[in-house]
Amino acid sequence: MVKLAFPRELRLLTPSHFTFVFQQPQRAGTPQITILGRLNELGHPRIGLTVAKKHVKRAHERNRIKRLARESFRLHQHTLPSMDFVVLVKKGVADLDNRALTEALEKLWRRHCRQAPAS
């Protein structure tokens, strides 16, 4: 049976983890969200989230966006390639409802799966 947990090892935790992804990213994006990815050697995907106060003013909106991104990643973790992902949020994302945001994230996960080199 497939576990759908979200343990600590599935998260990017340190600035060096984020820097690693920013150096040579593979990009997939919409006007409101960009997901950067870079292959890792761990055998499983990891995610890091950046939701700037500059783009989403209210804390409860930032928390909602991060919660939906984490949940989307958690549900797709077994179909994703072994990559480190950073979810970047742009202006206008707070205007999306939960369904539209979830659909956008799913579309971006599928795009990363197609772009990933076969392993």
From Swiss-Prot:
GO cellular component: ribonuclease P complex
A single BP term in Gene Ontology: tRNA 5'-leader removal
Record carries keyword tRNA processing: yes
Catalytic activity of the protein: Endonucleolytic cleavage of RNA, removing 5'-extranucleotides from tRNA precursor
One example GO MF annotation: tRNA binding
UniProt superkingdom: Bacteria
InterPro entries xref list: Ribosomal_Su5_D2-typ_SF, Ribsml_uS5_D2-typ_fold_subgr, RNase_P, RNase_P_CS
Pfam families according to UniProt: Ribonuclease_P
Keyword check for DNA repair: no
EC number: 3.1.26.5
Keyword set, alphabetical order: Endonuclease, Hydrolase, Nuclease, RNA-binding, tRNA processing
Subunit and interaction comment: Consists of a catalytic RNA component (M1 or rnpB) and a protein subunit.
Function in brief: RNaseP catalyzes the removal of the 5'-leader sequence from pre-tRNA to produce the mature 5'-terminus. It can also cleave other RNA substrates such as 4.5S RNA. The protein component plays an auxiliary but essential role in vivo by binding to the 5'-leader sequence and broadening the substrate specificity of the ribozyme.
Family per record: Belongs to the RnpA family.
Protein name: Ribonuclease P protein component
